[in-house]
Amino acid sequence: MLHSLPIRRALISVSDKGGLVPFARFLADHDIEILSTGGSAKALADAGIPVTEVADFTGFPEMLDGRVKTLHPKIHGGILGIRDNPEHQRAMAAHEILPIDLVVVNLYPFEATVAKGAAFEDCVENIDIGGPALIRAAAKNHEAVTVVVDPEDYQPVMDAMTAEGGATTLELRRKLASAAFARCGAYDGAISRWFQGQVGDETPRHIVFAGRLRQTLRYGENPHQKAAFYGHGIARPGVASAEQLQGKELSYNNINDTDAAFDLVCEFAEPAVAIIKHANPCGVAQGASVVEAYKAALACDPVSAFGGIVALNRPIDRDSAVEITKIFTEVVIAPDADAEARAIFAAKKNLRLLLTGVVADTTAPGLTVRSVAGGMLVQDRDAADLLSADLKVVSKRTPTERELADMLIAFKVCKHVKSNAIVYVKDGATVGIGAGQMSRVDSARIASWKADEAAEAAGLAQSPTQGSVVASDAFFPFADGLLAAAKAGATAVIQPGGSMRDDEVIKAADEAGLAMVFTGLRHFRH
């Protein structure tokens, strides 16, 4: 086994030329012959670095508009030949194949081409063929060949060569080979997913997901669990794309909760705020301004909001920053923040401030993935957008315009509450949220109890659920959950419908004087 091998000849063919010139100059200073192609060769020559064109090295020109550059025995034989195998060495000598010890390749920007909405033909032309072949060949023969697919690895290679007298260690080569195969897998996965979308294959025989390491986390949900955060490059504004302006590194739970918060608040067209704990909303509201929305959202459950995540769908101004910093908040995420708001947050050193630049389109298609023992569940993300025209009035009484507006907000929030979910809303703000109960009637009771508790703490004469509307994420299987909401003071109900006992539930609503609408749309969240 070959451990520390000197590098004498390198092949460089890169699309991302960041850091290329300093790295190549380092190689040249170590008397390493550099072979290169096209734009890479030009960049090196322009920098005054000695370089040999691959076409001159092989004696075979680039052809087919550059589709064939490095697919040649003198290239692949030089990479794949086993250095201590006599037969390989005899064959290489017979065909005048020289060993290539370092392969530096990064691939055509296929993912970026797709992300910018390029035409089908442009996307196809950005599918790299020669690059993956070079990478896989070098990674396979990692006992003798060093492969680099990421500019971030230039420095570790230079450090190793400096320490090892122009060589790299087997340990480093294996690590780089692992990264190389991972990059090829991610690249092929991106291509296959794009093609599946182009041909409308909703349940492909094989599916590949890949991500790039964004952050090694201190631990996972709990301190005994290891964790990391990966970005997959899909252009959707949120925690993965946000700029963190201040505060400690995000934890696993911070990331999970912040994602839930921003996903929820982006549902709203009007200025809105969501406060989240353990991926469930403590309070959500829309208002004429974000500061009004924040105050209303906080009023829903100020006790649970302590140490929570605050998401806004508008830039943060001074007044909202003042209100948010009155209690301990882990993370604030918003499209932007003005200078005064940033200065106020800066005084709270532990508060993490994330800015996304824009809000997300919650109706855009996407996938959610969950692992199970021996497999994974893949589904479309819940991107359904409910409009008033979609509602079916099933009660004798028709909801008022105010009730209708609050119903749509309540059902919007319900979509983001763990099932079984019950949400009371009044005047554009949640006033009671019941989450995650095995019994729907218990969720209704808990939401009412939480509202009563908040009202008592605020010194209100009556519970804010009086005169509210109530939403359920799934149908009421019996009338008991609806009656619990009526007892809490709700005047109108929005629910999917579809129970075998819908008639019984409708009758109970009519007897209680409630207006009720069916959506025909369920929002389970587990």
Swiss-Prot record:
Q: Does the keyword Coiled coil apply?
A: no
User: InterPro entries given for it?
Assistant: AICAR_Tfase_dup_dom_sf, Cytidine_deaminase-like, MGS-like_dom, MGS-like_dom_sf, PurH-like
Q: Which residues fall in a coiled-coil region? A: none
Please give the Gene Ontology molecular function terms for this protein.
IMP cyclohydrolase activity; phosphoribosylaminoimidazolecarboxamide formyltransferase activity
Report domain MGS-like positions: 1-149
- Hey, which family's this protein in? Belongs to the PurH family.
Protein known as:
Bifunctional purine biosynthesis protein PurH
